[in-house]
């Protein structure tokens, strides 16, 4: 089964070919004007004939009773000489193409059409046309075709055939022999077969409008095949009603809508299967009461030639050469791809070749994800400082406990507008936004502007520490809390102060563990709070806050001042009024220490490879806690117990390892 992409390629070719054979808007407008004008003129001719016939009646026959008014009106309508005009052929089916625009109308008559009636209509029709339009038309009669030929005198040149017909001709043929009543035909009766063909065309038009017009791509394929019949003499005998039947049966029997290319292939498959050949299923005419073969007029040789041509066209279509069937240039691919040339390098030798991309200067970094990530990180570091607190967070820090109220909600359901308000020092501020959160943010911006604080997402840094100035750090983030060392250099408020901080350092896992473990050893029960989280999934920035001795510390990344930040944090943690108490020697109970140390060391040795120990450098410079030995690296690579990698801490008592298999493991063991 062919892929969908090949069908899509066929669809493109078929639609491009269809656009070249479809009539232009000017041609379609000319057709519509000509057909409408002739139809209206024939209506006027019918009225003129009725008035002429009524003028010849006696005066006594014109008196009509009121009770018989409706009945006589219907009889008069049915007794008109010209009953009506209807479209047939290409005009009714919508199958007009360029250079093949045969226009046909059928003029229904009450009686059998005669040459006298034909001449009468032909003589009065130009007069009625002149009353309707200023355009010039040539009107001729064609007795052999039982029709009137009308041609326009300007471009595009169009020809319209009006065929006279009467239902009485078919009614006589359908009567049985016993019921047949010999009626004298007029001596100048028009060709009976031409009239019957016109009536058959009328039935074909009605059938086509009911069955084929609703099928997707059916009309398009018919126009394509009509063009093929005009170009290729082999296909000419199939042109007309048989071609319409084949297309309707081929496309209508599919259980889903077909595209133009697939529908054309399905018709070709149907013809290539041999339905036209003798002994095949044939083609039944659905518009005839008796079983009729619509291909009866074709010879055996013509059927074989069409079948052979359809098989050849099907092979071309299967190999992606449908443009040859349509006689058009191949279209370029809808999805062009980059072609790489095979090149032979001198380094690899003359006999080696590889598929290589052309080298493009300046794009090497884009190919390497690591370089691209570093470049993006550099852009972030060089860009403006990222505000870790928006206006709403800053206002809540300055004035905690503010109550925001929803004043109104307006706008449609898909685009609501919320209006929020807040009362600050007796002044009410209002702002609107597409959501409550956005409206609150807009209110906070207004309040900060009124209070004189910097607003926006990029706040100005009011003061900096001496260490930050020495590092020439140009990109900073504004956060809370001025340092106590800079109170003389910064103007602040006593109650609510905008605190300024720099971005936190980029810490490795070992450095983070060193700070956290040291803080947990010195200050038990510290609580860390997540202030904000920014950045994409590949570049997250977390702002954490911890309170030590009543002073809050915040850290965020990325930055380059790793060593200084760690040093300042450790100095704050291990200095101050509590430093002396921390350095005091603690008395370690001998018995309990021996037991706990033995148990901890034994368990540490049993853990084995694959179970990581405590973080590297976690207890460097810290006093050993009672009851267990601070392991440091403890078990490098997890093979066996070992001394700490950075040396043993001061004042640490070394005890021998003792094993007590029956002694229970204490519940506070750290493993």
Swiss-Prot record:
UniProt-listed PROSITE patterns: DS_RBD, DZF
Coiled-coil residues: none
SUPFAM superfamilies noted in UniProt: dsRNA-binding domain-like
Claim: DNA-binding is one of the keywords in the record: yes
Disulphide bridges: none
A cellular-component GO term for this protein: manchette
SMART domains the UniProt entry points to: DSRM (SM00358), DZF (SM00572)
Keywords: Cytoplasm, Developmental protein, Differentiation, DNA-binding, Methylation, Repeat, RNA-binding, Spermatogenesis
Function comment: Involved in spermatogenesis and sperm function. Plays a role in regulation of cell growth. Binds to double-stranded DNA and RNA. Binds most efficiently to poly(I:C) RNA than to poly(dI:dC) DNA. Also binds to single-stranded poly(G) RNA. Binds non-specifically to the mRNA PRM1 3'-UTR and adenovirus VA RNA.
Protein name as it appears in the record: Spermatid perinuclear RNA-binding protein
Organism: Rattus norvegicus
Organism lineage string: Eukaryota, Metazoa, Chordata, Craniata, Vertebrata
């Amino acid at each position: 089964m062919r892929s969908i992409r090949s069908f899509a390629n066929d669809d493109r070719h078929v639609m491009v070919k269809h656009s070249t054979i479809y009539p232009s808007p000017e041609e379609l407008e000319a057709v519509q004007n000509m057909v409408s004008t002739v139809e209206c003129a024939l209506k006027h001719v019918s009225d003129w004939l009725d008035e002429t016939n009524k003028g010849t009646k006696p005066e006594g026959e014109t008196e009509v009773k009121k009770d018989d008014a409706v009945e006589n009106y219907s009889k008069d309508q049915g007794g008109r000489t010209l009953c009506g005009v209807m479209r047939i052929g290409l005009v009714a089916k919508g199958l007009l193409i360029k250079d093949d625009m045969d226009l046909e109308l059928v003029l229904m008559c009450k009686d059998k059409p005669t040459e006298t009636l034909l001449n009468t209509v032909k003589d009065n029709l130009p007069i009625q046309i002149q009353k309707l339009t200023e355009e010039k038309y040539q009107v001729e009669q064609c007795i052999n075709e039982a029709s009137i030929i009308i041609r326009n005198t300007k471009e595009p040149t169009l020809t319209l055939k009006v065929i006279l017909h009467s239902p009485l001709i078919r009614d006589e043929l359908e009567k049985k022999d016993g019921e047949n009543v010999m009626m004298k035909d007029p001596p100048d009766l028009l060709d009976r077969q031409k009239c019957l063909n016109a009536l058959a065309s009328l039935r074909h038009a009605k059938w086509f409008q009911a069955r084929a017009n609703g099928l997707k791509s059916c009309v398009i394929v018919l126009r394509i095949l009509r063009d093929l019949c005009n170009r290729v003499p082999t296909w000419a005998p199939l042109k007309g009603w048989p071609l319409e039947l084949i297309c309707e049966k081929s496309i209508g029997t599919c259980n889903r809508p077909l595209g133009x290319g697939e529908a054309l292939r399905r018709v070709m498959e149907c013809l290539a299967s041999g339905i036209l050949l003798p002994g095949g299923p044939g083609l039944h005419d659905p518009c005839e009461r008796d079983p009729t073969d619509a291909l009866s007029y074709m010879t055996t040789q013509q059927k074989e030639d069409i079948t052979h041509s359809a098989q050849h066209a099907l092979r071309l279509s299967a190999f992606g050469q449908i443009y040859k069937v349509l006689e058009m240039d191949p279209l370029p691919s809808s999805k062009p791809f980059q072609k790489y040339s095979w090149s032979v390098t001198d380094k690899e030798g003359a006999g080696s070749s590889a598929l290589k991309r052309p080298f493009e200067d300046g794009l090497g970094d884009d190919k390497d994800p690591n370089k691209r990530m570093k470049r993006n990180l550099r852009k972030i570091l060089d860009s403006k400082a990222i505000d870790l607190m928006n206006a709403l967070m800053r206002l809540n820090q300055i004035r905690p406990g503010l109550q925001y109220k929803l004043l109104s909600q307006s706008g449609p359901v898909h685009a609501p507008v919320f209006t929020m308000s807040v009362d600050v020092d007796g002044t009410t501020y209002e702002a609107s936004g597409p959501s409550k959160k956005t409206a609150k943010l807009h209110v906070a911006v207004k309040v900060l502007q009124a209070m004189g604080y910097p607003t926006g997402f990029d706040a100005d840094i009011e003061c900096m520490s001496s260490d930050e100035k020495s590092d020439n750090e140009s990109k900073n983030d504004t956060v809370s809390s001025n340092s106590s060392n800079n109170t003389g250099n910064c103007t602040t408020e006593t109650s609510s102060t905008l605190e300024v901080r720099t971005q936190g350092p980029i810490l490795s896992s070992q450095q983070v563990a060193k700070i956290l473990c040291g803080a947990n050893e010195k200050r038990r029960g510290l609580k860390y709070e997540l202030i904000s989280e920014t950045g994409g999934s590949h570049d997250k920035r977390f702002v954490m806050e911890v309170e030590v001795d009543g002073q809050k510390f915040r850290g965020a990344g990325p930055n380059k001042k790793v060593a200084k930040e760690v040093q300042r944090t450790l100095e704050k943690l291990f200095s101050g009024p509590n430093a002396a108490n921390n350095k005091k020697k603690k008395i370690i109970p001998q018995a309990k220490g021996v037991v706990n140390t033995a148990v901890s060391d034994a368990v540490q040795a049993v853990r084995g490879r694959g179970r990581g120990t405590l973080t590297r450098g976690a207890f460097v410079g810290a006093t050993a806690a009672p009851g267990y030995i601070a392991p440091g690296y403890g078990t490098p690579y997890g093979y066996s117990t070992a001394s700490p990698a950075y040396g043993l801490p001061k004042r640490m008592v070394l005890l021998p390892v003792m094993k007590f298999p029956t002694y229970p493991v204490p519940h506070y063991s750290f493993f």
